[in-house]
Amino acid sequence: MKKLICLFAVFLMLCGRAFALDANDLLPPEKAFVPELAVADDGVNVRFRIADGYYMYQAKIVGKTDPADLLGQPSFSKGEEKEDEFFGRQTVYHHEAQVAFPYAKAVGEPYKLVLTYQGCAEAGVCYPPVDTEFDIFGNGTYHPQTDEPASAKDRFLQPSSQNGSGALPPPKGDEGGDSRFKLSWDTLNANLLAFFLAGLGLSFTACMYPLLPIVSSIVVGDKKAGKARAFVLSVVYVQGLALTYTLVGIVAGLTGALLTVWLQQAWVVLAASALMVVLALSMFGLFNIQLPNAVQSYFQNQSSRLSGGKIVSVFIMGILSALIVGPCVAPPLAFALGYIGQTGDAVLGGLALYTLALGTGVPLIAIGTFGGHILPKAGDWMNAVKYAFGFILLAVAVYLATPHLPYYLVVALYTLLMLVPAFMLLVNGRRQKRRPKAVAFALGGILLIGGAWFGWQGANGKTTALHHFLTLNPPAEAGKSSEHGKMFADTAALKAAMDTALKEHPDKPVVLDFYADWCISCKEMAAYTLNQPEVHQAVDMERFFQIDVTANTPEHQALLKEYGLFGPPGVFVVRSDGSRSEPLLGFVKADKFIEWYEQNR
């Protein structure tokens, strides 16, 4: 951790105390997080009273109404930055959180408000998302519909998870989405480098070649310019180009909170995935995305009227050039904007797109400074760059849709995304000259071997680190064995498997572990405890059962209630006579886990 490491260390120490934590020490969610409403003419203000030792996630606070769309964009009170190893930087609240939901339109009739929120206990237990419903009346009063949180089946908003089971992990600067690719201040250098390299890649597509005459005119406009002057003018031109991209990035960052809420819905995620496929097809040349000819001509005429050699004129040329070339690079730019939008940070968004523009502008600066003779000649290699971006966009489409697709279909799609370009490189490489042919054969061979290996491993149920990374989770069949035992999402299948194990060996207990994707301590247990060799030596992992309650279905809620839990993690030793141990709550290290198990087996 780079910042807040002391706070995070305190958090881990509190989690470590969970070995002595009793389930009775935890408050039910309706007492840990208590919403109070103030209904005004212009909106609804919500104040959450948060019990000591608990905290809430800002990005998990959502308001929905019936009739729909009565509320505008919410504003939040200032929260605290919490750094999490698994989910990145989070904004959380202790003690109190205030949210203002303005009305988006006139409200004259009573309506129903559903507040969705989620939080955790500092001791290491996370609660499932809670829905609380209120009837709002026109005279400024309100009434809770029930004393209990709304059930999952009554939700207006059904968050989607990264394993397809239904609930989104805690916000990533936010789950959403996904912690594998997160733009945050802690990963700023790596992310800016990635955006710079992406911009550099875009500069080698045919999209940027219309800008070369403009760059040449910049230098020609100052006939006495040496290389130093030409360099300065080229840099100023690229800064104008970058300004347009930066403003777009800022807008994407400002709308990030809205994108986060929308991206929790399956249909939005799948629509975004379909859009990536369409954009990829444009990179393969099936159709072109461009401004109407009349609009393009207007911007080109305005640019040509500006005289070269003058700083202000050159800067404005750069701005207009971004508008000319922008639609041509729309497919990869659309992905970049969606990626930035998850941050909700205007500064980060602006920095990311500014860096992308700088990468795009490097060859333009080189051309303006040293002349066009250093530019590679146009040819098939430019199409190869476009095709590469097309396959990247297809991979992004699969990545977005992964939580909603069967495991083996995801494996098959990724396999095709490696094998198809491999065959294209191997077939087309034969027509190239010696050096391009060698490069094409090398890349094609790597992709061919990698694709065949990835597909074979996935088809045989052998999940490697790459499979976990790309597919988010191993096959979701009930009872699939892993290094963490047997994972179930269906409670009936879990109970049947546990009953069978206890009947076969009544003298041996089984272990039941409650898990969820949005549970930080569950991730810690998986990463630092359950995968340790000493745990596998002490515990028979064939008798270790995990129930994935990420979806928080009514069946999951009933099972949690049956075992006296408000949320995961919770580990029990269950015996053949029907008795079970007190739960192990929160994160503990391997030695403490083994000690607890030996005491309760």
UniProtKB/Swiss-Prot annotation:
Cytoplasmic membrane side: 213-242, 288-310, 368-380, 428-437
Membrane topology: Multi-pass membrane protein
Any one annotated GO CC term: plasma membrane
Segments for region (Disordered): 148-176
Thioredoxin domain segment(s): 467-601
Domain of life: Bacteria
Any GO molecular function: protein-disulfide reductase [NAD(P)H] activity
S-S bridge residues: 120-126, 207-328, 519-522
Transmembrane segments: 192-212, 243-263, 267-287, 311-331, 347-367, 381-401, 407-427, 438-458
Example GO BP: cell redox homeostasis
Alphabetical UniProt keywords: Cell inner membrane, Cell membrane, Cytochrome c-type biogenesis, Disulfide bond, Electron transport, Membrane, NAD, Oxidoreductase, Redox-active center, Signal, Transmembrane, Transmembrane helix, Transport
E.C. number: 1.8.1.8
Signal peptide as annotated in the record: 1-20
Catalytic activity field: [protein]-dithiol + NAD(+) = [protein]-disulfide + NADH + H(+); [protein]-dithiol + NADP(+) = [protein]-disulfide + NADPH + H(+)
Location within or outside the cell: Cell inner membrane
Residues exposed to the Periplasmic side: 21-191, 264-266, 332-346, 402-406, 459-601
InterPro entries in UniProt: Cyt_c_assmbl_TM_dom, DsbD_gamma, DsbDN, DsbDN_sf, Thiol_diS_interchange_DbsD, Thioredoxin-like_fold, Thioredoxin-like_sf, Thioredoxin_domain
Enzyme class: oxidoreductase
Role, per record: Required to facilitate the formation of correct disulfide bonds in some periplasmic proteins and for the assembly of the periplasmic c-type cytochromes. Acts by transferring electrons from cytoplasmic thioredoxin to the periplasm. This transfer involves a cascade of disulfide bond formation and reduction steps.
Record-stated family: Belongs to the thioredoxin family. DsbD subfamily.
Name the UniProt record assigns to this protein: Thiol:disulfide interchange protein DsbD
Organism, scientific name: Neisseria meningitidis serogroup B (strain ATCC BAA-335 / MC58)
Gene name for this UniProt entry: dsbD
